[in-house]
Amino acid sequence: MPFLCVNVDHVATIRQARLGIEPDPVTAAAMCELAGAVGIIMHLREDRRHVQDRDIELISKTIQTEFHFEMAATEEMQQIALRIDPATVCLVPEKREELTTEGGLNCIGQEKRLTEYLAPLHEKGIGSSLFIDADADQIKAAKAIGAEYVEIHTGHFADAPTRSEQKAELTRIIDGIKMSQDLGLKVNLGHGLNYVNILDFADVPGICEYSIGHSIMSRAIYVGIDRAVRDMVEIIRNFAD
């Protein structure tokens, strides 16, 4: 059975709108755990636009499930990851002008650099994931780099303007999942997934985790974090193993 990991970055976004102390993403993370999430995700961006260093320090010390740390492949983030010792790091691309991550990491041509970058993290027992598009060459590069997981970017699927385009993206993602699995990579999915479009993956076997943040926190405004997380956990619980 696949599992749910909740991204609490959007709680930090609301807090930073007033540069205050609430809502606290650390408190939100604990509530997500109590509601059934098996992992908490935070992305510490280089510009610190939402999550702050204080947040990841506290999360790493307080959560009872797994902490998945999203980060750019910079020296600063590598040192932070080595210090806080998350369950996994997920390398993602960053552009300062983007509102949110717009696409997958380009691994092609970076195999040597990223292999060397991840080496000290692997030596410490930290798992690794690469956030990539469902592209055959990217998947092959991820395998060459030695990542344990790939998180396949589902944003183009989620944002497709028509059902036919969405189906085409779905096919591309499913092909990417199968190829990743054939190469021995574990597969997570994330970006833009919500309570409706996630149903398209109900019969797709072998997905380890779904990484979901925005849609859960959006629903939480109306029904609360506990109910919003439990609703998503219940949907995923019925998916293929």
UniProtKB/Swiss-Prot annotation:
Binding site for 3-amino-2-oxopropyl phosphate: 7, 18, 192, 213-214
Keyword NAD appears in the UniProt entry: no
Site (Transition state stabilizer): 151
InterPro entries: Aldolase_TIM, PyrdxlP_synth_PdxJ, Pyridoxine-5'_phos_synth
GO CC list: cytosol
Superkingdom field: Bacteria
EC number: 2.6.99.2
Alphabetical GO biological process terms: pyridoxine biosynthetic process
Keywords: Cytoplasm, Pyridoxine biosynthesis, Transferase
Annotated catalytic residues: 43, 70, 191
Entry-linked SUPFAM superfamilies: Pyridoxine 5'-phosphate synthase
Its biological purpose: Catalyzes the complicated ring closure reaction between the two acyclic compounds 1-deoxy-D-xylulose-5-phosphate (DXP) and 3-amino-2-oxopropyl phosphate (1-amino-acetone-3-phosphate or AAP) to form pyridoxine 5'-phosphate (PNP) and inorganic phosphate.
Protein's name in the database: Pyridoxine 5'-phosphate synthase
Organism: Maridesulfovibrio salexigens (strain ATCC 14822 / DSM 2638 / NCIMB 8403 / VKM B-1763)
